[in-house]
Amino acid sequence: MTRVIVEAVVKPSEDKDKVINAIRNFFDFDKIREEEHGMEKLLIAESNSLTSLLKLHRLLREQRILDAARKYLMKSIVGSRITFMLNKQVAAIGKLSFIDKEHESPLGPIKVTIDYKDPVIVVDWLTPKTAKGVPLWENAIPPEE
């Protein structure tokens, strides 16, 4: 089953709506819930469709980061899952910045998990190989499971 989950911690110094907007800048979720963790809140946005990633698909092209993003996403595959993190503050201004460690995003990262039967197909759709910055192909969005 296709499933996309995006998680972000809201620190006490942050505005929850701004964190939600940072998520919305690249992800269209079906539902969002909030969990209390002491002074912090955890936002969990979910979707059961890859169409929720169409904004991410567009931003990867607009920002001309297909090659770097492809390498990052390919190394993020484990089994039928892709898991990666984005800098929350950069996402808040509508840009993408992949990070390897949580501390690279001072207010915490945005964690993205994509479950799909063949994650390489998802990576090929999101980030096709390029030649001189031009995609070698543009695949249709992978079919829903």
Curated annotation (Swiss-Prot):
Matching entries from Pfam families are given as: RNA_binding (PF01877)
Q: Write down the InterPro entries for this protein, in alphabetical order.
A: PAB1135-like, Ribosomal_uL5_dom_sf
Alphabetized SUPFAM superfamilies for the sequence: RL5-like (SSF55282)
Q: What HAMAP family does the record tag this protein with?
A: UPF0201
The family database entries (PANTHER family) matched by this protein are listed as:
UPF0201 PROTEIN TK1335
- Family, similarity comment: Belongs to the UPF0201 family.
Kindly give the NCBIfam families that the UniProt entry links to this protein.
PRK00447.1
Its protein name is UPF0201 protein Saci_1285
Q: State the species of origin.
A: Sulfolobus acidocaldarius (strain ATCC 33909 / DSM 639 / JCM 8929 / NBRC 15157 / NCIMB 11770)
